Amino acid sequence: MEKLTMLVLVAAVLLSAQVMVQGDGDQPADRDAVPRDDNPGGTIGKFMYILHGCPFQPWCG
């Protein structure tokens, strides 16, 4: 019984290691995708957004 428990534990560790090595299965299309522009206004647009919005969210009424 003890050998069976040890065998199951070793198998679980090996399967876990295999999943970590394989990663999350990124497809080539995902890796080569063009990053989305979160700031289409450039630096000026980002600065104006900060001035317009409230930088301290919990304290804004």
Curated annotation (Swiss-Prot):
InterPro entries: Conotoxin (IPR004214). Its main location: secreted. One of its GO terms (molecular function) is toxin activity. The cysteine framework is C-C. The keyword RNA-binding does not apply. Its target is unknown, but this toxin may modulate voltage-activated calcium channels (Cav) or calcium-dependent potassium channels (KCa). The modification 4-hydroxyproline is found at P58. The keyword rRNA-binding does not apply. Belongs to the O2 superfamily. Contryphan family. It comes from the Eukaryota. Keywords: Amidation, D-amino acid, Disulfide bond, Hydroxylation, Ion channel impairing toxin, Neurotoxin, Secreted, Signal, Toxin. Residues 24-52 form a propeptide. Disulfide bonds join C54-C60. The modification Cysteine amide is found at C60. This is Contryphan-Li2. The modification D-tryptophan is found at W59. Expressed by the venom duct.
